[in-house]
Curated annotation (Swiss-Prot):
Any Pfam family: GATase_5
Keywords, sorted A to Z: ATP-binding, Cytoplasm, Glutamine amidotransferase, Hydrolase, Ligase, Nucleotide-binding, Purine biosynthesis
Catalytic center residues: 85 (nucleophile), 202, 204
The reaction(s) this protein catalyses: N(2)-formyl-N(1)-(5-phospho-beta-D-ribosyl)glycinamide + L-glutamine + ATP + H2O = 2-formamido-N(1)-(5-O-phospho-beta-D-ribosyl)acetamidine + L-glutamate + ADP + phosphate + H(+); L-glutamine + H2O = L-glutamate + NH4(+)
Assembly: Part of the FGAM synthase complex composed of 1 PurL, 1 PurQ and 2 PurS subunits.
Gene behind the chain: purQ
KW Cell cycle (keyword) present: no
Domain Glutamine amidotransferase type-1: 2-224
Role description: Part of the phosphoribosylformylglycinamidine synthase complex involved in the purines biosynthetic pathway. Catalyzes the ATP-dependent conversion of formylglycinamide ribonucleotide (FGAR) and glutamine to yield formylglycinamidine ribonucleotide (FGAM) and glutamate. The FGAM synthase complex is composed of three subunits. PurQ produces an ammonia molecule by converting glutamine to glutamate. PurL transfers the ammonia molecule to FGAR to form FGAM in an ATP-dependent manner.
Protein name in the entry: Phosphoribosylformylglycinamidine synthase subunit PurQ
Length: 224
C-alpha cells in the first residue's frame, strides 16, 4: 500500500504524517498537489497546516484544487481517505464530509492535548479501539469548531458516522471538555463511505513513542 500525503502551499504536517506512517511500516509518499495522485495510490492523507494561508476560509482554496477531483474519485472507489486538521477543513469544503469547521469559540489559536471518546469502533479508523475508549491526542487550530445543521447532525448520529467526541479524562462528554465549541462535541466524522474520515485533532502527533503518547496510532492503522 502507498499512501499519498498531499502537500499544498502552506501544508506543514506532511513530514509528521510521513514519519508516523513509516513508524507503522505503512508506505507513504508526499505528493505535490499539482502533480496529481500516483497510479499506485492505495490511500490518501490530507495533512494539517495552513493551505494558501487560510485565505477566504480555512481549506476553501485547496478544496478547489484539481487534485481534489482525484481524491473524490478515490473516495467513491472505497480507497481510504483521511483529512486531519487543515485536511479536515479541506475535506468538508470539498464535500467529502458534511458540516463545516469555523472559528474557535475562544476566537484564538489553540494548541493543547485533548481527550477524545471513541463513538464507533467499527470503522477502519477506529477498529484498533473499543467503543467508549478515551484517547489523548493534541489539537492545533484556530478554526476547528464543527458546525452542522441539526437535521444533518441527527443523520450523522443515526448512521453512526460520528467517530470521536471531545471528552474529559473519564470519558464524560461535557461543554467544559469541548476545546473549541464544536457542536455536540464532535471531533471526527465519516463521509458517506466509512473509508473516508476527517478529524481536527492530530493522530500523527500522538504516534511516536520517542516524543509522547501513542494513542493516535490506531487512527493511522486505518490505512492498512
Amino acid at each position: 500500500m502507498t499512501v499519498a500525503i498531499i502537500r499544498f502551499g502552506g501544508s506543514n504536517c506532511d513530514r509528521d504524517a510521513e514519519r508516523a506512517l513509516a513508524h507503522l511500516d505503512i508506505d507513504a509518499e508526499i505528493v505535490w498537489h499539482e502533480d496529481g495522485l500516483p497510479e499506485e495510490t492505495t490511500g490518501v492523507m490530507i495533512p494539517g497546516g495552513f493551505s494558501y494561508g487560510d485565505y477566504l476560509r480555512a481549506g476553501a482554496m485547496a478544496a478547489r484544487a484539481p487534485i481534489m477531483d482525484d481524491v473524490r474519485e478515490q473516495a467513491e472507489a472505497g480507497v481510504p481517505v483521511l483529512g486531519v486538521c487543515n485536511g479536515a477543513q479541506i475535506g468538508s469544503e470539498g464535500d467529502l464530509t458534511p458540516g463545516a469547521f469555523t472559528t474557535n469559540r475562544s476566537a484564538r489559536f489553540q494548541c493543547e492535548p485533548v481527550y477524545l471518546r471513541v463513538e464507533n469502533a467499527e470503522t477502519p479508523w477506529t477498529e484498533a479501539y473499543e467503543d467508549g475508549e478515551v484517547i489523548e491526542v493534541p489539537i492545533a487550530h484556530g478554526e476547528g469548531r464543527f458546525e452542522i445543521a441539526d437535521d444533518e447532525l441527527e443523520t450523522l448520529v443515526d448512521e453512526d458516522r460520528v467517530i470521536f467526541r471531545y471528552c474529559d479524562a473519564d470519558g464524560n462528554v461535557t461543554d467544559a471538555a469541548n476545546p473549541n465549541g464544536s457542536k455536540d462535541n464532535v471531533a471526527g466524522v465519516l463521509g458517506e463511505h466509512e473509508s473516508v474520515a476527517v478529524l481536527m485533532p492530530h493522530p500523527e502527533r500522538a504516534s511516536l513513542p520517542d516524543i509522547g503518547p501513542t494513542d493516535g496510532q490506531g487512527v493511522l492503522e486505518g490505512f492498512r
